[in-house]
């Protein structure tokens, strides 16, 4: 059987960089990983509660974390200014306080910045979230996939593949459906491929969404 490797990990050091950057002694490694997970969960939960638009669409493309001895720098990359949390300055300060409490680490400063992405539909996380929202609203999975591909094409991507697995349209037997448009060269290391996997809870059960986007070739 074919062995599937994560496209992001496969390209680390060439076309992809680490989303979390820090150094630790082996005995502290697991604690740092758990800390990263707490930061990501806390930010996503806060944004979900305090969004300007109550559609359930967070629009977070990715989170970048950099740690130093006395500082944790978190960068939130978002797709649209309409999805910014209420009152940017006050909201970021509240978010920073929430994350600091969750980490229970007062000897390090926490700095959070928000960066807007120029072409949001070039980001697989945002497209996956869009598809998930459509599926929750009982839109046909094929229609949701085709619309996501249209949005990606408008962002001038070179290729995209969208895959959904589970009890599609409420059928009793789970299956996998996918659509590809353009080139998605997964075996070419110099090809910059963005990838994400996303789970969505629907009335028929859990569906898994995977998206590969061919951005450029170096």
Curated annotation (Swiss-Prot):
Main location: plastid
One BP term from GO: translation
Annotated KH type-2 domain residues: 47-118
Localization, UniProt: Plastid, Chloroplast
Matching CDD domains: KH-II_30S_S3
Statement: the UniProt record of this protein carries the keyword Transmembrane helix: no
PROSITE patterns the record matches: KH_TYPE_2, RIBOSOMAL_S3
Gene Ontology terms for molecular function: rRNA binding; structural constituent of ribosome
Gene Ontology CC terms: chloroplast; cytosolic small ribosomal subunit
Keywords: Chloroplast, Plastid, Ribonucleoprotein, Ribosomal protein, RNA-binding, rRNA-binding
SUPFAM superfamilies noted in UniProt: Prokaryotic type KH domain (KH-domain type II), Ribosomal protein S3 C-terminal domain
InterPro entries: KH_dom-like_a/b (IPR015946), KH_dom_type_2 (IPR004044), KH_sf_prok-type (IPR009019), Ribosomal_S3_C_sf (IPR036419), Ribosomal_uS3_bac-typ (IPR005704), Ribosomal_uS3_C (IPR001351), Ribosomal_uS3_CS (IPR018280)
HAMAP family: Ribosomal_uS3_B
Subunit organization: Part of the 30S ribosomal subunit.
Family membership: Belongs to the universal ribosomal protein uS3 family.
Protein name: Small ribosomal subunit protein uS3c
Organism, as annotated: Amborella trichopoda
Gene assigned in the entry: rps3
């Amino acid at each position: 059987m074919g062995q599937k490797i994560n496209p992001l990990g496969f390209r680390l050091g060439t076309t992809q960089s680490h989303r979390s950057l820090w150094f630790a002694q082996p005995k502290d490694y697991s604690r740092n990983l758990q800390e990263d997970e707490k930061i990501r969960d806390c930010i996503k939960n806060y944004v979900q509660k305090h969004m300007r638009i109550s559609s359930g669409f967070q629009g977070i493309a990715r989170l970048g974390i950099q740690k130093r001895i006395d500082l944790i720098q978190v960068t939130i990359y978002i797709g649209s200014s309409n999805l910014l949390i209420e009152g940017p300055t006050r909201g970021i300060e509240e978010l920073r306080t929430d994350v600091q409490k969750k980490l229970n680490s007062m000897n390090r400063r926490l700095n959070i910045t928000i960066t807007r992405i120029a072409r949001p539909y070039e980001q697989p996380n945002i497209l996956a979230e869009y598809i998930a929202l459509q599926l929750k609203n009982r839109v046909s999975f094929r229609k949701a996939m085709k619309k996501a591909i249209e949005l990606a094409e408008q962002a001038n991507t070179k290729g995209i593949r969208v895959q959904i697995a589970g009890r599609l349209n409420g059928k009793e037997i789970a299956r996998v459906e996918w659509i590809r448009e353009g080139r998605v060269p997964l075996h070419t290391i110099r090809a910059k491929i963005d990838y994400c996997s996303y789970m969505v809870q629907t009335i028929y059960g859990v569906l898994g969404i995977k998206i590969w986007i061919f951005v450029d070739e170096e």
